[in-house]
Protein backbone atom coordinates (compact mmCIF):
# COMPACT_ATOMS: atom_id res chain seq x y z
CA UNK A 1 0.00 0.00 0.00
CA UNK A 2 3.06 2.27 0.08
CA UNK A 3 2.23 3.73 3.48
CA UNK A 4 4.67 5.02 6.09
CA UNK A 5 4.14 5.83 9.75
CA UNK A 6 3.11 3.91 12.85
CA UNK A 7 0.31 1.48 13.64
CA UNK A 8 -0.26 0.79 17.34
CA UNK A 9 -2.35 -2.22 18.32
CA UNK A 10 -3.64 -2.56 21.90
CA UNK A 11 -6.56 -4.22 23.71
CA UNK A 12 -8.28 -0.81 23.81
CA UNK A 13 -8.08 -0.37 20.03
CA UNK A 14 -5.91 0.91 17.19
CA UNK A 15 -3.97 4.11 16.64
CA UNK A 16 -2.95 4.78 13.05
CA UNK A 17 -0.51 7.57 12.27
CA UNK A 18 0.08 7.15 8.56
CA UNK A 19 1.15 9.08 5.49
CA UNK A 20 0.96 8.28 1.81
CA UNK A 21 -0.95 8.97 -1.36
CA UNK A 22 -4.66 9.66 -0.81
CA UNK A 23 -5.63 6.49 -2.69
CA UNK A 24 -3.32 4.36 -0.52
CA UNK A 25 -4.68 5.86 2.71
CA UNK A 26 -8.31 5.46 1.69
CA UNK A 27 -7.70 1.89 0.51
CA UNK A 28 -6.14 0.93 3.82
CA UNK A 29 -8.93 2.60 5.83
CA UNK A 30 -11.51 0.73 3.77
CA UNK A 31 -9.88 -2.56 4.80
CA UNK A 32 -9.66 -1.57 8.48
CA UNK A 33 -13.21 -0.22 8.71
CA UNK A 34 -14.63 -3.35 7.09
CA UNK A 35 -13.94 -4.95 10.50
CA UNK A 36 -17.00 -4.36 12.70
CA UNK A 37 -14.77 -3.40 15.65
CA UNK A 38 -13.35 -0.43 13.76
CA UNK A 39 -16.25 0.63 11.53
CA UNK A 40 -16.93 3.77 13.57
CA UNK A 41 -13.27 4.72 14.07
CA UNK A 42 -12.75 8.49 14.12
CA UNK A 43 -10.46 9.54 11.28
CA UNK A 44 -8.44 12.75 11.35
CA UNK A 45 -6.93 13.86 8.06
CA UNK A 46 -4.34 16.51 7.30
CA UNK A 47 -2.38 17.34 4.17
CA UNK A 48 1.40 17.39 3.82
CA UNK A 49 3.63 18.28 0.87
CA UNK A 50 5.87 15.34 1.70
CA UNK A 51 5.77 12.05 3.62
CA UNK A 52 7.05 12.90 7.13
CA UNK A 53 7.94 9.30 8.07
CA UNK A 54 10.81 7.11 6.87
CA UNK A 55 9.22 3.67 7.29
CA UNK A 56 6.15 1.75 8.41
CA UNK A 57 6.18 0.39 11.97
CA UNK A 58 3.58 -1.88 13.55
CA UNK A 59 3.74 -2.24 17.34
CA UNK A 60 1.68 -4.22 19.83
CA UNK A 61 1.33 -2.41 23.17
CA UNK A 62 -0.55 -2.85 26.45
CA UNK A 63 -2.02 0.65 25.93
CA UNK A 64 -2.08 3.16 23.08
CA UNK A 65 -0.74 5.80 25.49
CA UNK A 66 0.74 4.42 28.72
CA UNK A 67 -1.40 5.57 31.63
CA UNK A 68 -3.63 2.98 33.34
CA UNK A 69 -4.57 -0.34 31.68
CA UNK A 70 -7.90 -0.37 33.55
CA UNK A 71 -9.06 2.70 31.60
CA UNK A 72 -10.60 1.57 28.33
CA UNK A 73 -11.96 4.52 26.30
CA UNK A 74 -13.79 2.11 23.98
CA UNK A 75 -15.95 0.97 26.88
CA UNK A 76 -16.68 4.42 28.27
CA UNK A 77 -18.41 7.46 26.84
CA UNK A 78 -16.37 10.50 27.75
CA UNK A 79 -18.20 13.80 27.24
CA UNK A 80 -16.48 16.00 24.69
CA UNK A 81 -16.50 19.72 24.02
CA UNK A 82 -16.28 20.82 20.40
CA UNK A 83 -13.71 23.45 19.40
CA UNK A 84 -16.51 25.93 18.64
CA UNK A 85 -18.07 25.39 22.07
CA UNK A 86 -14.74 25.77 23.85
CA UNK A 87 -14.04 29.01 21.99
CA UNK A 88 -17.46 30.32 23.01
CA UNK A 89 -16.81 29.39 26.63
CA UNK A 90 -13.38 31.03 26.53
CA UNK A 91 -14.86 34.17 24.97
CA UNK A 92 -17.32 34.38 27.90
CA UNK A 93 -14.94 33.14 30.60
CA UNK A 94 -17.46 30.50 31.72
CA UNK A 95 -19.52 27.59 30.39
CA UNK A 96 -23.09 27.90 29.12
CA UNK A 97 -24.48 27.41 32.65
CA UNK A 98 -22.34 30.23 34.02
CA UNK A 99 -19.97 27.87 35.83
CA UNK A 100 -16.29 28.80 36.18
CA UNK A 101 -14.10 27.27 33.47
CA UNK A 102 -10.70 25.65 33.94
CA UNK A 103 -8.48 24.25 31.19
CA UNK A 104 -6.06 21.45 32.08
CA UNK A 105 -3.12 20.80 29.74
CA UNK A 106 -2.42 17.04 29.86
CA UNK A 107 0.79 17.23 27.82
CA UNK A 108 4.33 17.08 29.16
CA UNK A 109 6.47 20.07 30.13
CA UNK A 110 8.41 20.11 26.85
CA UNK A 111 5.19 20.44 24.84
CA UNK A 112 3.60 23.00 27.16
CA UNK A 113 6.72 25.18 26.95
CA UNK A 114 6.11 25.67 23.21
CA UNK A 115 2.56 26.90 23.67
CA UNK A 116 -0.79 26.38 25.38
CA UNK A 117 -4.18 27.95 25.94
CA UNK A 118 -4.19 31.20 27.89
CA UNK A 119 -4.53 30.60 31.65
CA UNK A 120 -4.51 26.79 31.23
CA UNK A 121 -3.23 24.84 34.21
CA UNK A 122 0.15 23.25 33.55
CA UNK A 123 0.42 20.11 35.72
CA UNK A 124 4.22 20.16 35.22
CA UNK A 125 4.63 16.52 34.27
CA UNK A 126 7.52 14.92 32.40
CA UNK A 127 5.46 11.95 31.22
CA UNK A 128 1.78 11.10 31.05
CA UNK A 129 1.92 8.50 33.83
CA UNK A 130 2.65 11.36 36.27
CA UNK A 131 -0.72 12.99 35.58
CA UNK A 132 -2.81 11.17 38.25
CA UNK A 133 -0.55 12.45 41.04
CA UNK A 134 -0.61 15.93 39.52
CA UNK A 135 -4.42 15.90 39.32
CA UNK A 136 -4.62 14.86 42.96
CA UNK A 137 -2.45 17.82 43.98
CA UNK A 138 -4.63 20.16 41.86
CA UNK A 139 -7.94 18.70 42.99
CA UNK A 140 -9.00 21.60 45.21
CA UNK A 141 -8.58 24.05 42.31
CA UNK A 142 -10.66 21.83 39.99
CA UNK A 143 -13.61 20.91 42.20
CA UNK A 144 -16.87 22.72 41.54
CA UNK A 145 -15.70 23.96 38.14
CA UNK A 146 -16.11 22.91 34.53
CA UNK A 147 -12.79 21.34 33.56
CA UNK A 148 -11.75 20.85 29.94
CA UNK A 149 -8.77 18.53 29.55
CA UNK A 150 -6.85 18.99 26.31
CA UNK A 151 -3.85 17.54 24.48
CA UNK A 152 -2.43 17.52 20.96
CA UNK A 153 -4.80 15.16 19.16
CA UNK A 154 -7.34 13.92 21.69
CA UNK A 155 -5.94 10.63 23.01
CA UNK A 156 -4.29 11.67 26.27
CA UNK A 157 -7.04 14.09 27.25
CA UNK A 158 -9.65 11.37 26.70
CA UNK A 159 -7.92 9.10 29.22
CA UNK A 160 -7.33 12.03 31.57
CA UNK A 161 -11.03 12.98 31.51
CA UNK A 162 -12.08 9.40 32.26
CA UNK A 163 -9.67 9.28 35.20
CA UNK A 164 -10.81 12.63 36.57
CA UNK A 165 -14.48 11.67 36.38
CA UNK A 166 -13.66 8.47 38.27
CA UNK A 167 -12.32 10.72 41.06
CA UNK A 168 -15.67 12.51 41.29
CA UNK A 169 -14.80 15.51 39.12
CA UNK A 170 -18.03 15.07 37.18
CA UNK A 171 -17.87 18.31 35.21
CA UNK A 172 -14.75 17.20 33.34
CA UNK A 173 -14.72 17.10 29.55
CA UNK A 174 -12.17 16.48 26.84
CA UNK A 175 -11.50 18.82 23.93
CA UNK A 176 -12.75 16.92 20.90
CA UNK A 177 -9.85 16.24 18.55
CA UNK A 178 -7.39 18.12 20.73
CA UNK A 179 -5.48 21.29 19.90
CA UNK A 180 -5.01 20.34 16.26
CA UNK A 181 -8.76 20.12 15.61
CA UNK A 182 -9.27 23.37 17.50
CA UNK A 183 -6.77 25.09 15.19
CA UNK A 184 -8.44 23.54 12.15
CA UNK A 185 -11.97 24.60 13.09
CA UNK A 186 -11.67 27.91 14.95
CA UNK A 187 -8.07 29.07 14.55
CA UNK A 188 -5.70 30.01 17.36
CA UNK A 189 -8.06 32.17 19.45
CA UNK A 190 -7.08 32.06 23.15
CA UNK A 191 -3.95 29.99 22.34
CA UNK A 192 -0.44 31.34 22.76
CA UNK A 193 2.65 29.90 21.06
CA UNK A 194 3.05 26.77 18.97
CA UNK A 195 1.85 23.18 19.22
CA UNK A 196 4.39 20.37 19.32
CA UNK A 197 3.71 17.55 16.85
CA UNK A 198 5.50 14.21 16.69
CA UNK A 199 6.50 14.28 13.04
CA UNK A 200 8.02 16.55 10.42
CA UNK A 201 4.82 18.22 9.18
Regions found by a protein language model. Give the residues of each.
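Rhodanese-like catalytic fold shared by cysteine-dependent sulfurtransferases
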Residues: 1-79, 98-101, 107-147, 155-201
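A short acidic-Thr-Gly-centered motif at the start of a beta-strand
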Residues: 88-98
